[in-house]
UniProtKB/Swiss-Prot annotation:
May aid fertilization by loosening the cell wall of the stigma and style, thereby facilitating penetration of the pollen tube. Acts selectively on grass cell walls, which are relatively poor in pectins and xyloglucans and rich in glucuronoarabinoxylans and (1-3),(1-4)-beta-D-glucans, when compared with cell walls of other angiosperms, including other monocots. It is found in: Secreted, Cell wall; Membrane. Coiled coil: none annotated. GO terms for cellular component: extracellular region; membrane. It is a peripheral membrane protein. This is Expansin-B. Residues 1-20 are annotated as: Disordered. Keywords: Allergen, Cell wall, Cell wall biogenesis/degradation, Membrane, Secreted. Belongs to the expansin family. Expansin B subfamily. GO terms for biological process: cell wall organization.
């Protein structure tokens, strides 16, 4: 999916949605 901002993590990987 598109890049997301997770609380306390910042921008995630676009293909995972999780901080990598």
């Amino acid at each position: 999916g598109p890049p997301k901002v997770a609380p306390g993590k910042x921008i995630s990987a676009s293909f995972g949605g999780e901080w990598l």
